[in-house]
Amino acid sequence: MNYPHPLIAREGWPFLAGAFVISLLVHASAGFWWALPLWIITVFVLQFFRDPPRPIPSAPNAVLAPADGRIVVVEKTMDPYANREALKISVFMNVFNVHSNRVSVDGAVEKVEYFPGKFVNADLDKASTENERNAVVIRRAADGQVVTLVQVAGLVARRILCYTKAGENLSRGQRYGFIRFGSRVDVYLPLDARPRVTIGEKVSASSTILAELDVK
């Protein structure tokens, strides 16, 4: 499988290097038991920033999960970024999930918008409208249908990273962003999309099918 990114995300390299060096210095100067809590933190940082390749389903009208986590919302509501009624599916990431964000559909980026905001628990519904967030509006290459991906910062996560811009073409499963330390991604779909997940279900980025789009 071709996944052109290191298995440990680059976003975590400074944190991992710092944790490792401090643990090593304390281990050398004070011994293993004093350093043990620091080694545990180092292992946690290592697992948090893991970024493994994932198989990508071939179904042409599938909308793939943009993140690892748990489904917390499946509802019809307004998509304020594309100004339409939409089906909204939200994925909550806890600190033990992979936090690399991946594209749900093939298409061209129409708009990228960043919104400053609060940092309430990303598991709460109000996080979608009150928290710091970054929206990417994508128009599918195949049929022009619009899918909006919104990275939402959480109580601990206060750093949204997005690596795409308007006019770029994206592919399903492509890595496009990262959120540090607990967060969520909201996905807004056409109203006639058929959800394939339920609230409470665990999903994997670019492997789990969130919904199927109606063929146009």
From Swiss-Prot:
Pathway listed for it is:
Phospholipid metabolism; phosphatidylethanolamine biosynthesis; phosphatidylethanolamine from CDP-diacylglycerol: step 2/2
Is-annotated flag, keyword Ion transport? no
EC number per UniProt: 4.1.1.65
According to its UniProt record, where is this protein located? Answer: Cell membrane
- Quickly give the catalysed reaction: a 1,2-diacyl-sn-glycero-3-phospho-L-serine + H(+) = a 1,2-diacyl-sn-glycero-3-phosphoethanolamine + CO2
- The entry's keywords: Cell membrane, Decarboxylase, Lipid biosynthesis, Lipid metabolism, Lyase, Membrane, Phospholipid biosynthesis, Phospholipid metabolism, Pyruvate, Zymogen
Q: What is its main location?
A: membrane
Q: Per the record's keyword annotation, is Cytoplasm included, yes or no?
A: no
Listed GO biological process terms: phosphatidylethanolamine biosynthetic process
The active site consists of 183 (schiff-base intermediate with substrate)
- Cysteines joined through disulfide linkages: none
Stated family:
Belongs to the phosphatidylserine decarboxylase family. PSD-A subfamily.
The name under which this protein is listed is Phosphatidylserine decarboxylase proenzyme
Q: Which species is listed as the source?
A: Cupriavidus taiwanensis (strain DSM 17343 / BCRC 17206 / CCUG 44338 / CIP 107171 / LMG 19424 / R1) (Ralstonia taiwanensis (strain LMG 19424))
